[in-house]
């Protein structure tokens, strides 16, 4: 019976398909929208340095562990966890991993909708309009237009998933990722060559210990979850579509390099441009999530070729958002397929309904429903907090415990070294998965919850 189930499962065509799809999953709004504003806020170069160190240790370990578990079991998170025993704890660990993408994809698609709106306006030549004060807040508080943009983004994502792993995800990733790289280079060069931009390059690339604080580490850890799509059920799901002859270690290295390179490029696209525009004014650097939708249009409006830059930039952001939203949606769909024994069509429809329902709440949370607050947050911010700060650290701890206590690191090593494949960072992996990863995840969990309730300020 096992044999039959295995053969029916779809798969990536090979290493390139897997790497570009996994990199597509991990290169998303997290890299282009979240990374630069965190780097700007938490001290530039020192943040970047800590981020890279964490990606090579913590990030690497979690990617290897999740991919290996997916490939060993050939199942999405719930089934993968439950393959190792019947306990309630195991199935809870699986479900936490599985529910995260179901909650992220709706609000992610809302932000994707904002990106579509900005792109359309740039194509129409309305760059100056986008740069006007108050444009962004007026736009997001108008429920109808955000809802339409959100629906377009959500339906496009669902259409790709409907087409399947090879025809949908892999094909789109193979098309979009190379374009994404080229665009990020073009925009970074454009940004760095503006007058006054070099100060920004220096701030972003040169670590300055003066800017270091404990929060730099916590922020870099939180960003890594986002950025490498750890603890979202995605890598377990993608691992289950990965062929046995593809090296897990090599693929992980490729994904890490790809992901970190794009995050650095995004920093080079955004931070120097902000410096050129504002002369490194601390308030502009602290703009946070608004950096991409408020500051960047102002920067483009003040420079030559602003409209062209705006179009290229938002095409890039849109591609990054789509490659990630299809990974999140795939993860959700595969859970329903595996657990409810549904066909793909039915599972896509169910996920679509959830997406439109929860996403509409996030859209309306800035407009007609702005009076509703969950622990003082609007819907979108609340879903972001719940998934990124609470559930993902718990999911990561569950994965670490699964590997160290239930599956055993030996079995993971065997899976990674299947065939001719190497596992050079075996020692780092063992120490990280047993001790450091769960501790790091617990620190993120505790500090972000304490921050949300105002016990500490980050």
Briefly describe each language-model feature range.
Residues 6-9, 38-42, 77-96, 109-166, ...:
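Inter-helical loop and helix-membrane interface segments of multi-pass membrane transporters/permeases
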Residues 373, 378-401, 425-458:
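A generic transmembrane alpha-helix motif of multi-pass inner-membrane proteins
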Residues 11-22, 46-50, 88-102, 148-153, ...:
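Select transmembrane alpha-helical segments in multipass membrane proteins
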Residues 1-33, 62-67, 71-84, 88-92, ...:
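Membrane-interface "cap" regions at the ends of multi-pass membrane proteins
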Residues 14-54, 239, 250-253, 257-260, ...:
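Transmembrane helix-boundary motif of multi-pass solute transporters/channels
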Residues 3-8, 12, 170, 174-322, ...:
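Membrane-embedded translocation segments of transport machinery
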Residues 5, 79, 112-141, 242-245, ...:
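Helix-loop-helix connectors at the membrane interface of multi-pass transporters/channels
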Residues 38-42, 68, 89-104, 137, ...:
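Membrane-water interface regions at transmembrane-helix termini and the short interhelical loops
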């Amino acid at each position: 019976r096992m044999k039959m189930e295995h053969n029916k499962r779809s798969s990536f065509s090979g290493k390139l398909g897997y790497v570009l799809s996994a990199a597509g999953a991990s290169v998303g709004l997290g890299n282009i929208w979240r990374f630069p504003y965190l780097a700007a806020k938490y001290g530039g170069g020192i943040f970047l340095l800590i981020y890279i160190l964490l990606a090579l240790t913590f990030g690497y370990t979690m990617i290897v562990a999740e991919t290996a578990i997916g490939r060993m079991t050939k199942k999405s998170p719930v089934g993968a966890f439950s393959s190792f025993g019947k306990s309630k704890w195991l199935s809870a660990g699986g479900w936490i991993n599985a529910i995260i993408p179901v909650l992220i994809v709706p609000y992610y698609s809302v932000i994707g909708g904002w990106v579509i709106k900005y792109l359309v306006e740039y194509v129409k030549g309305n760059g100056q309009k986008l740069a006007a004060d108050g444009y962004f807040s007026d736009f997001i508080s108008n429920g109808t237009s955000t809802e339409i943009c959100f629906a377009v983004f959500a339906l496009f994502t669902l259409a790709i998933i409907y087409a399947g792993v090879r025809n949908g995800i892999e094909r789109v990733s193979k098309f979009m990722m190379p374009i994404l790289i080229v665009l990020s280079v073009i925009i970074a060069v454009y940004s760095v060559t503006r007058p006054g931009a070099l100060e920004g390059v220096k701030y972003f690339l040169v670590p300055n210990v003066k800017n270091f604080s404990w929060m730099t580490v916590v922020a870099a850890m939180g960003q890594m979850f986002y950025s490498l799509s750890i603890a979202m059920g995605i890598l377990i799901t993608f691992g289950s579509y990965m062929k046995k002859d593809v090296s897990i270690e090599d693929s992980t290295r490729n994904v890490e390099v790809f992901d970190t390179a794009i995050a650095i490029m995004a920093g080079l696209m955004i931070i120097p441009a902000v410096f050129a525009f504002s002369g490194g004014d601390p308030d502009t650097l602290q703009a946070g999530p608004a950096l991409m939708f408020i500051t960047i249009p102002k920067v483009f409006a003040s420079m030559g070729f602003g409209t062209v830059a705006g179009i290229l930039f938002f095409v890039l952001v849109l591609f990054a958002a789509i490659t990630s939203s299809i990974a999140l949606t795939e993860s959700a769909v595969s859970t329903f397929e595996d657990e409810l024994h549904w066909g793909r069509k039915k599972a896509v429809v169910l996920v679509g309904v959830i997406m439109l329902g929860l996403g509409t709440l996030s859209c309306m949370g800035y407009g007609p429903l702005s009076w509703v607050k969950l622990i003082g947050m609007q819907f979108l911010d609340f879903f972001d907090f719940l998934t990124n700060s609470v559930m993902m650290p718990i999911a990561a701890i569950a994965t670490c415990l699964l590997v160290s206590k239930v599956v055993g690191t030996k079995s993971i090593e065997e899976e990674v070294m299947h065939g001719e494949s190497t596992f050079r960072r075996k020692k780092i992996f063992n120490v990280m998965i047993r001790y450091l990863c769960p501790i790091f995840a617990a620190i993120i969990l505790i500090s972000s919850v304490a921050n949300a309730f105002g016990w500490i300020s980050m």
